[in-house]
Amino acid sequence: MPDHTTFAARHIGPDPQAVAAMLDVIGVGSLDELAAKAVPAGIRDRLSADGIAPGLDRLPPPASETEALAELRGLAEANTVAVSMIGQGYYDTLTPPVLLRNILENPAWYTAYTPYQPEISQGRLEALLNFQTMVADLTGLEIANASMLDEGTAAAEAMTLMHRASRGKSNRLAVDVDVFAQTAAIVATRARPLGIEIVTADLRDGLPDGDFFGVIAQLPGASGAITDWAALVAQAHERGALVALGADLLALTLITPPGEIGADVAFGTTQRFGVPMGFGGPHAGYLAVHANHARQLPGRLVGVSLDADGSPAYRLALQTREQHIRRDKATSNICTAQVLLAVMAAMYASYHGAEGLTAIARRVHGHAEAIAAALGTAVVHDRYFDTVLARVPGRAHEVIAAAKARGINLWRVDDDHVSVACDEATTDEHVAAVLEAFGVAPAEPVASEIATRTSEFLTHPAFTQYRTETAMMRYLRTLADKDIALDRSMIPLGSCTMKLNAAAEMEPITWPEFARQHPFAPASDTPGLRRLIGDLENWLVAITGYDAVSLQPNAGSQGEYAGLLAIHDYHASRGEPHRDICLIPSSAHGTNAASAALAGMRVVVVGCHDNGDVDLDDLRAKVTDHRDRLSTLMITYPSTHGVYEHDIAEICAAVHDAGGQVYVDGANLNALVGLARPGKFGGDVSHLNLHKTFCIPHGGGGPGVGPVAVRSHLAPFLPGHPHAPELPQGHPVSSAPYGSASILPISWAYIRMMGADGLRAASLTAITSANYIARRLDEYFPVLYTGENGMVAHECILDLRPITKATGVTVDDVAKRLADYGFHAPTMSFPVAGTLMVEPTESETLTEVDAFCDAMIAIRGEIDRVGAGEWPVEDNPLRGAPHTAECLVTTDWDHPYSREQAAYPLGKDFRPKVWPPVRRIDGAYGDRNLVCSCPPVEAFA
């Protein structure tokens, strides 16, 4: 175990004495003995004479927090923070300090998880409902989801949504020439394996001949032009096609929104609503539709329902659309998206309100008008919002250089055209410097009136009541107090790795040298960032045993997708494009199957034994049956059942012998770092979750980073980007070349401060805590799966099915009751219905782990009282959970258990009390009566 003065000792919860006590309960004498019993010898890395795991010897020695921050400061200072007037979907913004301090820098917001337990997630669910309302209002459409990964993936999802809605009438999509290049590239990536043909044309001239299922255009366009798309929408509808418009939300405060001209879908980004550019991300994309397409929406959708007392309450709606349930038939492979950034954008809109946003938009447009007036006839377009396209025959390089000399980055379109984008941070001084670069004198602006919007927006009290900093601060505190995040309790969600997000790791993400970088800025502006990215890529290669890494995927789902595309392109490069069969064990997460379907593969399910292991005989039979068409096997390791399968090397060999590739899902890498490397025990490709293993916070449901790591033969097929020729030539999966680059310093700092010994100790401690919980709880809730030596990996599955059969108490009852004890529930009914999957991580102290075990044991005692007939199945502390303060002070308490039993089942001194803000929520009611925007205030009366 690390010395107590190191960062590793601050990150790892149990001290050496606690670890020894846990190992004693498990029945082993040391961490190394535990590793020997849990991790198969055939894949386990052997330590060097210096005690360092192979690969980890390539990491630098651990740094202190002070040293790591000093190194990061040096990398930051190597960057140049120029004035960005590049545009192309990314704009500088002024983040209100009240939002920076109370959301982005607040662990109550950034350490929360996806709101699967809605009763203890009401704060961020309300914030997300505000986001959905904001997007719906601004776009003029009825319903929006709770964020997308970025604008490009939102466009790709818009395409597939329109394709599904058309029910196969056509496989052709029309894309306007003035769509952002990165957006068009991602749409093309998604279209190719799905057999969708893209026709790119200047749609100002109308829809090309032939049948189309959909149309995608931009408002304003990449060139800055504002086009009235009403005629195109009407023409498309006449010919049976749907229309999706990529719309700038700030511009929509002035111009007619997509919904009001008949568009079916709107997509885009909310980045300029207070979220820094961050060298590409993270930012919350958005997707909005008419109500008749609500069930086709991808991703999370927050809806309003009722709780057990009939009060309004928020929850995730229509979850049967999603990948964890529908697998390869899901609407998308997206899990969570960008909740933390969606909250930032929604609160930015609340803070400014409709009037404030409109004033910002008018100021931005005014600066663009000033530039256009001075340029005169050189301006290409008559109608524009923030971006002026100038014709400068043969002078583009000269103008760009002149602006750069004045500290400003412009956008070179080609040798003859330069684009200038204004934003919230643009000043009169910036405008003057731009005019000097063009060599023109200021001129009196001629108003190019673009304000055609007449409809109201953001009229709900959520967008009118919080204009002062005091009001906003208190609103954010009120919302945060309704939730359980890591700042209040462990979150033992299996397969989620809710570990510490250390303050030292988080600090650099708001530094302007990282936060204010445009993703398409000149490379000379970002040497520090590029070195940081290179460091992180090299360290991940060393840790995983692969040969190359791409950091572009901005979610685990996108890492999966990128890895599968690399496999497809590899087979095609060898003259075997017909290889399209993807074998997936029945225990796998639904995202695997959804990603395979998006990559154009056919999913064949491989059975598992009763002990959770892959059925080798069934695997061999499926490999034989599909030998000539076998593309890949997707397998999670350790398995989704929470054990190390001892046959993993044999499984990989069987697939390789048939010409297939092995995709090792890296969701559970926290049980492997420093112990085994997937790139060395048979994997050809893995995605990693930096938001799990490497400490990027979950943010209530995003951001995330899902790098894809590959062996050398797949490296040429890693994601590329139209604006980053230095990357491989694969197909882009994210809008920015390096994805969510501004949060990469978090993982850099974690690895830099932990070092080889600390990383290995983290894995071993996570395994120790999981096995300790398994031992303590097994007699109360049987552990469903263990490995050959009776060990679990970093998580364990508790089987409640026999208990439910005997008593009627369900896994849902136990999950809700845990909130009364002050805990977030483990993962429910995954990967096996009627079970709880518990993952404590290495960061929780023995005191916290014991408190969780004590709560679970007490709950088992309550279950036994139900089973004995002391409490009715329909009226007991579990079925009544969670209990609000309001329900406890009612004068009509007629339950067979006491108020004290409801609120303080282990006494008032057990742990700080968490008061759930609502009772148990009626999910079916919410889906039957779908409401996905802010309800009227009267609903809460």
Curated annotation (Swiss-Prot):
Its EC number is 1.4.4.2. Keywords: Oxidoreductase, Pyridoxal phosphate. It is an enzyme of class 1 (oxidoreductase). InterPro entries: GcvP, GDC-P_C, GDC-P_N, GDC_P, PyrdxlP-dep_Trfase, PyrdxlP-dep_Trfase_major, PyrdxlP-dep_Trfase_small. It catalyses: N(6)-[(R)-lipoyl]-L-lysyl-[glycine-cleavage complex H protein] + glycine + H(+) = N(6)-[(R)-S(8)-aminomethyldihydrolipoyl]-L-lysyl-[glycine-cleavage complex H protein] + CO2. GO terms for molecular function: glycine binding; glycine dehydrogenase (decarboxylating) activity; pyridoxal phosphate binding. Its cofactor is pyridoxal 5'-phosphate. Pfam families: GcvP2_C, GDC-P. GO terms for cellular component: cytosol; glycine cleavage complex. Belongs to the GcvP family. The glycine cleavage system catalyzes the degradation of glycine. The P protein binds the alpha-amino group of glycine through its pyridoxal phosphate cofactor; CO(2) is released and the remaining methylamine moiety is then transferred to the lipoamide cofactor of the H protein. HAMAP family: GcvP. The glycine cleavage system is composed of four proteins: P, T, L and H. This is Glycine dehydrogenase (decarboxylating). It comes from Mycobacterium avium (strain 104). The lineage of its organism: Bacteria, Bacillati, Actinomycetota, Actinomycetes, Mycobacteriales.
